[in-house]
Amino acid sequence: MREYTAIFICILICNVFICPKSFGQTDYTYKKGKSFKSTNALSMTDTIDLTSISSPIPYKKSIPGQTQTIACPVRLPGYVRGIFFSRDSRPGDFEWPNNTNRLLPWVFNDLKELTDTRYPGIPSNATPSTLGDALLLELTNGEYLFAKAVAGRNSLSWLQVNDNGSVTLYVSTLGKDYLKPEVPLLLIRQGKDIYSTIRQAYQALMKNTEAADLKSRTAKEYFEAFRYLGWCTWEHYHDDINESKIINDMKTIEASGIPIRYVLIDDGHLAHKNRQLTGFIPDKQRFPSGWKKIMSYKKENKIKWIGLWYSLSGYWMGLSPENGFPQVVRQALYPHAGSLLPGTDSTRIRSFYRYYVSTLKEQGFDFLKVDNQAFTLPLYMGGHESIRQATDCNRSLEAEIHRQNMGLMNCMAQNVINTDHTSYSNSTRVSIDYKKYDEDMAKSHLFQSYTNTLLLGQTVWPDHDMFHSCDTVCG
């Protein structure tokens, strides 16, 4: 009888102390329309006190085992007004952390304004997402406070504005893994003016190799082509491009006398199936000669450089299982949530990006515009080591672009993993797409461009998309 009693007590102990930790595990698999607002998390009792800053990147220690996500209340100092940096949000659309180019500055006098349905959204876009990546406050004492989410080795933090105007900081693996006992929480800095406060915050971030892989923009090389006037196919054709159109336009540019020194071939050339990449050769119907004829129009004193558009994860929805990659490259890929992805270890991810960059360099391209970067993390979410693998994609692209001496434009790269891992590249889009003949959108575009430059401009030169001389509103 004592033996049965001991077994029964053991079962009870297991149920009390082990089983509950496995209950309520969140499925972080990403899909359009899915929100992570107030996601299931272990609530921490100790407050992150921003009225007393002891470290630029504080760490949470002694996180209980088998914890996917923690939620920490944030104590804010008294403030006069501020800016919350987040994407916009609409029902059924993409949500955080797929920030694309939409890290938008939402101005407020009281944070709870951002949760009010009457808050005026950005023209032609939606209302503020209450899940965001950074917060800038003008304090009642005249100083400024800057706080920004950070990534760890396999963790990511974000700020949530609650209905009452309070703020909660979440930290999660965004996958099936559990948090390590110690993770970085956020980047914090307080100072007497906006510019030095943010600059000093980023200087501290650059020193933390767990949270970032960054250099100041002044410490990095600036790709030579970007010093000159260039022409991109997107604004004129969008994705309706082909070999003859581009060749004719290159001839026109050369004959015009306009000092355009580089051409960027944007989306519309890729071989894909269901928006998943099938190979690094162009669509054969649109580009029957591949890239050879187009490359023959490069001249040292005319159009000297040609760049090409691609997505960080291949195409908009990743890599197709029906691809023409060499077997050695296929071995570096694995299936997850309907797509093939590079991984699972760092070596395989690096080998994929070595192939990615070298293939395009061998075809004659001088630089790449790598788009859709913020969607790479969502493609990995819900699996194992989602954040670490997505970060490795950014690190590997940067390393291979540098090793193979190519240029890089970053685009739709406004989540923390992208912005905090630009070790070599020196240009990133800081705004949504430019719209012609729209005064409200022009004002919004300018405000986003120059406000975001306060942050992103610490480590890269800002790419403001484009402005049109024919635009009567903002030409």
Language-model segments: which ranges?
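Short boundary motifs at domain starts and secondary-structure transition points
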Residues: 213-224
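Preference for well-ordered, secondary-structure-rich cores of eukaryotic proteins
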Residues: 97, 103-170, 272-287, 291-297, ...
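Aromatic-lined carbohydrate-binding/catalytic grooves of carbohydrate-active enzymes
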Residues: 224-387
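Functionally engaged cysteine thiol sites
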Residues: 87-88, 240, 409-413
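Alpha-helix-loop-beta-strand connector modules within alpha/beta enzyme cores
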Residues: 294-298, 389-408
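N-terminal accessory beta-strand-rich subdomains and adjacent acidic, glycine-rich linkers
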Residues: 26-208
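Bacterial Sec-dependent N-terminal signal peptides
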Residues: 1-26
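Glycan-recognition surfaces
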Residues: 318-351, 355-361, 398-475
